[in-house]
């Protein structure tokens, strides 16, 4: 099978590329370095020639709801239009658990992406995943004021990005199924505890302070409204196991 991966160098996308190659598929990585611009659509027609399935794990890190919505809807429509021209049979899109239950600009953008996929004319599968273990590291780096690391008090059920990438490939190998069962890690965690654990394991200096961030999004997360529902696919690697794995790699 010939599989194209948008966002194929990202947190999940590079794992999807690895998994697809390990399973014997021919992989096309849709990146600017390969002459493909997802936002303008440049290079997509040539890249998707002969492709059977497209996995979209593309992402934009932004706090602007407008920018996020423009990015996800534009990229999705460009992909779907090029897929129709190329005769692609299946579009697999990565989304997030709970985006319809927590009011947040980025989540609204992902919902808009889902609607574009549903209306796009290419048979589709959408996989909603929980936050990745790597999310704790992003917050550890990004939420720091005067040497103090701020850790939001929220509940999550994080999953290894590698397992999400593998699941995307499994779905790509099957028939389009609409909304696939959500995917989450094996254990619920407090995000503040995750950040403390990672800081200790990686030698990050400075105190970690748990805080209750304002806003309806964080209130919904504290209440557990963005946790997976019944029937979710449950991964294997816990956050603690992932941290130990990262520490082992660093020490080599």
Question: Locations of the language-model features?
Answer:
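Mobile cap/lid helix-loop segments that border enzyme active or cofactor-binding sites
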Residues: 188, 195-252
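Glycine-rich Rossmann NAD(P)(H)-binding loop
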Residues: 150-155, 181-188
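A conserved pocket-lining segment of Rossmann-fold NAD(P)-dependent short-chain dehydrogenase/reductase
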Residues: 125, 138-159, 163, 175
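Non-catalytic, hydrophobic alpha-helical segments
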Residues: 12, 54, 161-168, 183, ...
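NAD(P)H-binding glycine-rich loop region in Rossmannoid oxidoreductase-like domains
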Residues: 21-86, 96-101
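Conserved beta-loop-beta element that borders a ligand/cofactor-binding pocket
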Residues: 90, 95, 100, 112-135, ...
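N-terminal Rossmann NAD(P)H-binding glycine-rich loop of SDR-like oxidoreductase domains
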Residues: 1-25
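Glycine/proline-rich active-site loop of Rossmann-fold NAD(P)-dependent oxidoreductases
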Residues: 134-146, 171-181, 204-206
């Amino acid at each position: 099978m010939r599989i194209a991966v948008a966002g194929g160098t990202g947190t999940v996308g590079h794992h999807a590329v690895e998994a697809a190659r390990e399973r014997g598929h021919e992989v096309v990585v849709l990146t600017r370095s390969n002459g493909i611009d997802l936002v303008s659509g440049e290079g997509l027609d040539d890249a998707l020639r002969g492709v059977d399935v497209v996995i979209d794990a593309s992402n934009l890190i932004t706090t602007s709801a407008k920018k996020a919505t423009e990015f996800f809807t534009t990229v999705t429509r460009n992909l779907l239009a090029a897929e129709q021209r190329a005769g692609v049979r299946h579009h697999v899109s990565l989304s997030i658990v709970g985006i319809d239950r927590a009011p947040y600009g980025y989540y609204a953008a992902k919902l808009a992406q889902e609607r574009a996929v549903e209306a796009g004319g290419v048979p589709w599968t959408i996989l909603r995943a929980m936050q990745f273990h790597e999310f704790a590291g992003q917050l550890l780096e990004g939420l720091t004021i005067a040497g103090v690391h701020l850790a939001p008090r929220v509940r999550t059920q994080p999953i290894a990005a590698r397992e999400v990438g593998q699941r995307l490939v499994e779905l790509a190998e099957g028939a389009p199924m609409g909304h696939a069962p959500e995917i989450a890690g094996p254990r619920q965690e407090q995000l503040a505890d995750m950040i403390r654990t990672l800081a200790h394991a990686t030698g990050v200096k400075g105190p970690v302070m748990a805080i209750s961030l304002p806003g309806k999004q964080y209130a919904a997360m504290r209440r557990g409204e963005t946790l997976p529902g019944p029937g979710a696919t449950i991964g294997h690697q816990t956050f603690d196991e992932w941290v130990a794995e990262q520490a082992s790699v660093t020490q080599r």
